[in-house]
Amino acid sequence: GNNTELNKIIKKYFEKWQDNNFVKTYNDTLLDYYITKNNINDKTKAEILSKTYVYGYVENYPYEALVKNKFVGIAAEYVNRITRLSGIEFEFKKYKNLDELKEAINDKEVDIFFDYYNIDSDAYLKTVSTFIEEYAVLGKVSDSHVVTSFESLKGKKVSLLNNTALYSYFKSNSKANIEKFDNMKTLLKKSDDNLIVVDNEVYNYYRNTKFKDYELLYSDLMTNDYYFMVNKDYSDFY
């Protein structure tokens, strides 16, 4: 089921995460690292630990989801790890859609969010990215597409989800003919013979369901990073 598949992806992601030496920053001395790095005094430390931070999100498998009243997913695991290691508490607030989340961010109703959607706000600070940003190029098995590199997408019709870091990366760097869609359902319905480009973890999650008629043609890293964004009012925590 969905839970089993999500657990597999999280496990796989953390294996890649460990292989790339990111654990050092997120080890058992995480809070002490921040305290020392930012010269935070005992009073500020107590304030950091006493507050419950509002984490805003839109359900986005496999990164952020609510399953049996638990916040789960790849991004969620980072936040839950902070709770386990430091005792910092979060209130997870789910929004119906991206517009609602953006409105809450503009009103500073959330203290932290995962910037999968490439949201710009001067009121928030970017954390250091610890994510592996990889994309997957998919084509229908019946169409016999050939993609051997990022450059080989030049002139090809490519479908992407709008309002994502991946879309911004392709818009800025690719010479493909890009068609953007607001949601996965519409993208799959109207892509026809287009190639589809999605986050690699999204592909892994849906490979046997939504993408069962597609084959993986090519994958690579993108230079646009995923970040957690933290309210500037809590810059000491950042």
Where are the predicted features?
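Short glycine-centered helix-capping/turn motifs at secondary-structure transition points
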Residues: 17-21, 108, 191-193
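Intrinsically disordered, low-complexity repeat and linker tracts
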Residues: 38-47
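Extended ligand-binding regions for polar small-molecule ligands
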Residues: 1-39, 73-85, 141-167, 171-172, ...
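Membrane-proximal low-complexity regions enriched in glycine and acidic/polar residues
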Residues: 136-140, 153-213, 217-221
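Acidic, polar ligand-binding/catalytic clefts
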Residues: 1, 76, 80, 84-85, ...
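A generic fold-level signal
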Residues: 48-50, 71, 130-132, 153, ...
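Secondary-structure boundary/capping residues
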Residues: 19, 23, 91, 178-179, ...
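Extracytoplasmic small-molecule ligand-binding "clamshell" domains
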Residues: 10, 46-124, 157-160, 168-190
